[in-house]
Each structure stands twice: as C-alpha cells, then as structure tokens.
Amino acid sequence: MVRLPRHPGAVPDLAHEQRWLPRLGPLLPVAVPEPVGRGEPDEDYPWSWSVYRWLTGANPTAGAVSAPRRLAEDLGRFVHALRRVAPQDAPAGYRSGALSERDAPTRAAIAELGGRIDTAAVTALWERALRAPRHEGPPMWSHGDLSPGNVLVDGDRLGAVIDFGCAGVGDPAVDLMPAWNLLPAAARPAFREAAGADDAEWARGRGWALSVALIQLPYYWRTNPPLAENSRHVIAEILGERD
C-alpha cells in the first residue's frame, strides 16, 4: 500500500510512522502498518511518501458492529498494550496534553454550531469534563486518533489499527474515544475494563471524544458527510449518558 500526502502538513506524520512503527508493532496484539519503503520528492511529486505492507480488513460503522463486546475487548487490549510500551525517547502525543488546552477551540465550535445541537447541554458536559482530575502518572503511549476510519475489522474481531501520525506519550485518555465514536453503550464496560481506565481517566476520555466531535462537526459539515455523521453520533451518545 502506498500513502501519498495530499498537503505538506501530512508529511511529518509519515516520517513519524517510519521511525516509530517498527518499534511499536512487535509489542502490540494486533497488526499495525509495517513500512517497507520510502519515496523521495522529485519533479513529479513534491513530498516524501511511504510504502506499507497490505493489511486486511474493513472500517467498522458506529451502530452497526456485529460483535460489539468482542471488538470492545480487542480494542481495550490494544490500548492497554500500547500504554505498556516504554516511553523513553518518545515524542509527546498530538492529543496527549491537558484537556484544558482544548477549551477555547471547543467553545468556539459550540458557538459555531449554534442551534444545530443542544449547546447548553454540551457546554455543561464539556465543563464537567474539564473538572476531571488531571493525569498525574508517568507519560504513556497513545495512538491519539482511534476513530472508526483508523480501525480495521476482520470478521468480527479487531484486525488492525492504522494511522499513527498522532501517536506519542503523555496522558493516554484520548485512546478511550472508541467508547463513544464506535462502541454501543452495552459494550463500553468491557472496553473500559480491558483498557484499565479509572474513573478520572474515563471522564477525560469522554471529554476528548466530545471535544473532537464538536470541533469536527462544523468543519466537516458539508465536506465530509461520514465524519460529520460520526461526530453527531458521538455527541448523541454522550448526551445520552447524562446522569
């Protein structure tokens, strides 16, 4: 498989994968992209590009997972295994900082969405997430973008996880996002148990899922219907969990 960046901002992600995937892959319980070559820019194409071994599977759809508990356990084991990788010399993850760093863009997205969502309810949920205790332990690895588009299902099991451009170390709570962007409510406890998330981390993970969905929704409203639909799904799932 060949990955060709469509804009210069994506070029560092491929270099990141070329460096770190050979180290991470052998330590993880499911397949990840295996770089086998790298192309250099020339007069026909302006950026570096990567070649990977082909991975089998298909992207799952939120609300249509055939064996949700099994997938939840597989995803949780992947998250747990990634966290156990030693963080020495690893870069900071793209989404591994404090949740408060996303406060301004999240509130701006809520304002932009206006009457298209229940802005009062999502603001209250966002403020609740900001009150969750911060990560106080050592930095841990996270994938950073565990969305349905970066998960491959083979049969009814997790076959592979792709796109590690956001991966790095810090607070790993962002990797709990599949609980809301993919899994049904009944499968969330199995995912949480397999991942080993405590109450504070679960609250931060919910906050990450909400923030990412709120920011993506107005951005992709007209340009990427599948991502916009998944963002609406996440918001609805989190609203449905209100105490």
Model-assigned labels for residue ranges:
Residues 1-98, 112:
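ATP-binding pocket architecture of kinase catalytic cores
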Residues 2, 35, 126-176:
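Active-site acidic catalytic loop and adjacent metal/ATP-binding pocket
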Residues 16-19, 23, 77, 124, ...:
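Generic recognition of well-ordered alpha-helical segments
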Residues 17, 21, 48, 103-107, ...:
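A general structural signal for well-ordered alpha-helical segments in protein cores
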